[in-house]
Amino acid sequence: MKNDIFLKSLKKEPIARYPVWLMRQAGRYLPEYRAIRQKYKSFLDFCKNVEDAAIVSLQPVDILGVDAVIMFSDILVLLEPMGIKVSFEAGEGPVLDHNFDFKNLKSQGISGDLSYVFELLKVLKEKSPVPVIGFCGAPFTLASYVIEKESSRDFTKTKVFMYENQKDFHILMEKLSEALVEYIDHQIKSGADVIQIFDSWSMSLSRFAYKEYVYDYNAFIIKSIKQKHPNTPIIYFFRGSSSHIEDAVDLGADALSVDWSVCINDVCKRYPDLVFQGNLEPQILLLDKENIRKHVEEFVMCIPRDTAFVVNLGHGITPDVSKDNVKYFVECVKEVSYGKRNLFKKC
């Protein structure tokens, strides 16, 4: 591994600048990605082709110069071996098919049907000059897709089901949690240097609901993986960060990836034992270069001095940004943070 600054930051070792990578860095904004994606009618078929998945995973490292590679896959691939049919409709996102018989979902021995994920990680571990990130969805985020059977704007079905069918909801969460522990374990054994858990839909929950219905499952997964792989950093990404941060800090993750609803300066000072990742708005990448640099400078200025940190967005890159802007953003983060923080006032 030629560049391990990302791992060093997660482990709070001395670094000369902040590492930077971006959620959805392998995606439609890259012409090089689109050239490969067009070969496949099915998104899942694309994910299952190890050779092409490896190529698009590594593209951001070669093109943008990011400090980590995240495997190209989808959080929903775990559901197929559990017994839930998943398809991706053109322009409409994922569609799931099942009969709500959650007690019969398979939660153990699911790894054999996910061998393409583990083969991809082995290839990336061999070829990548930077640390490799494996990932999965958090139980509640996956449960939301299962209950809604598709993407949702307000998660009404999920919350009604959670409150009215508590027994079945907890059965589903338990099954997902058990499967996730096995899945993450195999990812690490296959070469993942870091694991990121995506809880994208935690933003739909009140603090009470998060603590009552979700928290224990997240804590169980992180504790289980830490017992098996104590030296592998775990990042927990959660939207609605301002609502749930007081609970998330106790989950046991090494780092929290937060959205733009929190002040980085504030959370870094309040929770100095944790590493934070984030949290710029993705829309910044749509600005002209002068304004991109301005936002990067202001952001770096707000990170407390001598704080371990990973620069990222508060959510994924949108397809409408230009490759040049993303590359410039990465360059700015490196340049501004490299030994130049003394040029800027503290927040």
Swiss-Prot record:
<dbReference type="GO" id="GO:0005829">
    <property type="term" value="C:cytosol"/>
</dbReference>
<comment type="function">
    <text>Catalyzes the decarboxylation of four acetate groups of uroporphyrinogen-III to yield coproporphyrinogen-III.</text>
</comment>
<dbReference type="InterPro" id="IPR006361">
    <property type="entry name" value="Uroporphyrinogen_deCO2ase_HemE"/>
</dbReference>
<keyword id="KW-0210">Decarboxylase</keyword>
<feature type="binding site">
    <location>
        <position position="315"/>
    </location>
    <ligand>
        <name>substrate</name>
    </ligand>
</feature>
<dbReference type="InterPro" id="IPR038071">
    <property type="entry name" value="UROD/MetE-like_sf"/>
</dbReference>
<dbReference type="InterPro" id="IPR000257">
    <property type="entry name" value="Uroporphyrinogen_deCOase"/>
</dbReference>
<feature type="binding site">
    <location>
        <position position="74"/>
    </location>
    <ligand>
        <name>substrate</name>
    </ligand>
</feature>
<comment type="subunit">
    <text>Homodimer.</text>
</comment>
<keyword id="KW-0963">Cytoplasm</keyword>
<comment type="pathway">
    <text>Porphyrin-containing compound metabolism; protoporphyrin-IX biosynthesis; coproporphyrinogen-III from 5-aminolevulinate: step 4/4.</text>
</comment>
<feature type="site" description="Transition state stabilizer">
    <location>
        <position position="74"/>
    </location>
</feature>
<keyword id="KW-0627">Porphyrin biosynthesis</keyword>
<dbReference type="Pfam" id="PF01208">
    <property type="entry name" value="URO-D"/>
</dbReference>
<feature type="binding site">
    <location>
        <position position="200"/>
    </location>
    <ligand>
        <name>substrate</name>
    </ligand>
</feature>
<keyword id="KW-0456">Lyase</keyword>
<comment type="similarity">
    <text>Belongs to the uroporphyrinogen decarboxylase family.</text>
</comment>
<protein>
    <recommendedName>
        <fullName>Uroporphyrinogen decarboxylase</fullName>
        <ecNumber>4.1.1.37</ecNumber>
    </recommendedName>
</protein>
<dbReference type="GO" id="GO:0006782">
    <property type="term" value="P:protoporphyrinogen IX biosynthetic process"/>
</dbReference>
<feature type="binding site">
    <location>
        <position position="145"/>
    </location>
    <ligand>
        <name>substrate</name>
    </ligand>
</feature>
<dbReference type="GO" id="GO:0004853">
    <property type="term" value="F:uroporphyrinogen decarboxylase activity"/>
</dbReference>
<feature type="binding site">
    <location>
        <begin position="24"/>
        <end position="28"/>
    </location>
    <ligand>
        <name>substrate</name>
    </ligand>
</feature>
